[in-house]
């Protein structure tokens, strides 16, 4: 049964006015006037009641009323969670040890969406509480159409140095499903390509153009290998920005900064930044003979997932090359652990002379590939860069030396077509040696530096 506007009570009009006013404030905030089409429905809920929103309440069948009451509650909860997660805050669980010991694996975070301003979803039709895949059934948790362009509404502030930030992994646009928890598609493709062309190439003897051709060959071969072997690598999927894996890192570089790592110390514009209290690196720790007691691991805060006992005989040659050669009376190598340690933990272990024989920082041979994947450098995790971080409106001169650093920003994030031909660089069909960035960029890094 519906009512006329004359029959509506004063209380109904007040509630309706408040609801519409709040909704208009919301539309102004998100700058989306398409939402005005919802106002007649709000008016109907409070005043005219022509749409039978609660038709099931009048059913004579108690089973219908019971089932529909649950359906009604679930739909309301899902809609509420959807909007809260997008515009106010969202719960996340830490998936990796990247920020150990500041944040631990499995920790739950409530992340404010209003600090930097909520991002309007790229894929609005999605299931709340599922990032990209529905549990059990394993299908996509979102519908790819429609897709909205990137837009962020005003928030309370901007990203600052040392802020801990949750973001969608930029290189997660393409994933090989069987490897999505361990590496991105591009790192996997370059790595597989290098494995296929296993012959060592003297990159120092090549020009930048020749080096680029080698990396292009690696990527093409690796990509073909992945696409042609779905049983091994899984289906290859493309994901919109808001459906890529969530990462949590610390901001160590802002737009316009020049970042460099010197002997493990992050430098911004030539000056050392303040290190996080729980900054840690990976080490190999050899004892004088006994195993490290569980009690000591608990006191140090080193979890089972963070430690590896290098007992397999296959490790021996590598350990000896590092100088971890302490042996017991039977000639067997004393126990060696692979551990992430803060400075305090390092000093505690090193000071225990009765238990600890040697501590060696993890060599670069244990490091994986580093950004950019198609640029030959002699950078490593402890000595890296310098790299200038792009800022909106800034123009750079493109050269063979810096193009691999910025081409992903130009192509994947800012939507341009880039080609490198024999006579130069072409962007959107025009030859150029300059590019002006459309967006700000930030450098994120974990406190667990060698695992980030």
Pin down the residues of each PLM region.
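Extended hydrophobic leader/signal-anchor segments used for secretion and membrane insertion
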Residues: 2-452
